[in-house]
Amino acid sequence: WDIEVPGYKVNNKEWLKSQVSRAFLPKYFPNYEKYLWIDCDAWVNDWNSVELYFKACDNGKLGITQTIGPGYKITSKVNWLIGKLAVIKSQNFKHAVKSKIGYAKARKLAFAPHINIGVFSLEKNSKAWSLWQKNLAIALKAGNIFGSEGLAINMSVYIDDLETEFLPLNCNWITSNLLPKFDEQKEIFVEPYLPNYKIGIMHLAAGIWKDGKDMRINKEIKIEIETLDNKKILKSLRYIN
């Protein structure tokens, strides 16, 4: 483990090491100038997004995408109690409270647009690595292993003001948040709203579920999506080779 965690948190789930080691990529792959991480449930639909990520991390910046954009009807979950009283249920706030980083910091994260760590780019010598590692160590003291690396990067950006190049939503298109459309003429997935830019990286985070089955695991699953000609077709959102 790059950061020691109690055995009871691991509970024989050795794969959780990957949740920590992601913040130490240059240690494991030292001979590269730039690093682009793409989760295993994501795939490249348009190569231009890859070039954008490599450009985004110039001069030590973090290249990453916020999970907010046209068509998002809700950005944070809130349970309203009575009048103005409410319980904040945003992903950042929930993880921050669980990790006991302090309410002052948790409040700064509460309504900040969540940053998904499934796709990002960094230069080898960026100070972002050490900042991320520092915040990850803090988050792991009380929080769960799974999700701590995401909380740590949100802390680095929104609390420590890590210099960040925010890329368009289509550079990390989370399908469970908003389904794409399909351009049948060009045979490519596109954004559902004008001007219907190409999806850069399709990310099946949280899964696409049908009849209790997850498309990430079951290659046979297809769902109904719209085309640019307003037709409805059955389509898999997986990479098809």
Write out the residue ranges for each language-model feature.
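Glycosyltransferase catalytic domains, chiefly GT-A lineage
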Residues: W1-N241
